[in-house]
Each structure stands twice: as C-alpha cells, then as structure tokens.
C-alpha cells in the first residue's frame, strides 16, 4: 500500500472515516501515514494549488488534528484557517484504541511536528524544489541525516523512547558486487560513490553487507522501520 498520503489533498474528515473503516475490516492493522506533500506534480494532477510550504504545513497540521479527534470517542468541533468542523462524531470508530500515525518529512518544521505528534517518524530528503533532482541527493548524506535525526530527538523530549524511527531506501541493489554497482550508479547520478555506501537512503551490496549496515544504522540513528519499494521486495528477501 501507500506509505504516506498527502494530507492537504484530502478532506481530513472523509479520510478519517475511510481509515477507521479499514481498521475495522483489517481487525486493527491500519497505520496512518501522512505528509504535507512536496511534489508539484501531485498537486497539478489533483488540481490543487501548490501553496507556499508554510501554508501547506499549516493545512497539514490542522488536518492532522481533525483526523486524531475523529478517531476518539465523542463529538468534537475544530475551527481553523483551513478547516471547520462542528459537533462531529465520526463513525465508524477504529478497532485500535490508538491508531499509529507515521509522519514523514525532511525539513525542520515538519520533523518537529512529527517529533511531537507521530508514533513513527519518517526521515526524508529535503525536497524544497518540488521535484526529484540534485538537491535531494545533497540531503541524503549521513551528515544531513544526523541533522534531521537531531531535530526529532530535540523535539520529542521525554516521548523519544516511544517513537519508532523510519526511513525509505530509495536506492536498492542486492548484489555480491556492491562496489561495482555503487560505482556505476554514482556515475549515472553524478554523486559521490562514498555517499552511496554511507547514506541510509541507499542499500547496495550483498545480503551480509546490508544486514550489517542496517544494524549499524539502527544503532546510530534508531532506524528500526525500513521501507523498500515494491519493485525491490523480492530481491531484498535474502536480507530479511
């Protein structure tokens, strides 16, 4: 299924009803992945204005509050800049008393929100340009991830131990020729080969090498929840 839904592109009340219904049908297996959205094409395809980052994040924060309230017993009202809800008692209610929320982000404000509000925090590259390009690779380095994780740790306070850290590996190749694969990919992407070895967004190497790397990254950054794309699932099975 999808990892993170772009909340500003959805009505939060309708989305909450859909998610609660899925939780009922799956007997409590739903995990809510939400983000403010960064890809311009997502907004263009849906016919939604691609507002400034601050506006998109404000809308996201309001919508997040509504979804959380919908999942709780009783009616509620919430009146904000982007949404107005009056006396709403959303039904159905989910099976889980607290449906886990995953919030993914790459910038300071969204990561700070995630640290306060999420059960699972997804660390992403910064995508201020609105498209995948050189800027994204610059924010995939281990130094950039150090900074992002530090924001989460500072913002989480005493709830840090209850947060699960998540990352998506965008560059995956399970191969016994890890050095050769990294060299070829570095040339294609015009990036430093060493970055492809150290970046937690990349998993390129043999099953044994990748297992060791995943353990190192869990120790350093706390990443215990790692996502690979559907296209990589079968070849990643030996690592699991």
Predicted regions located by residue number:
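Active-site-adjacent structural elements that line small-molecule/cofactor binding pockets in enzymes
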Residues: 1-240
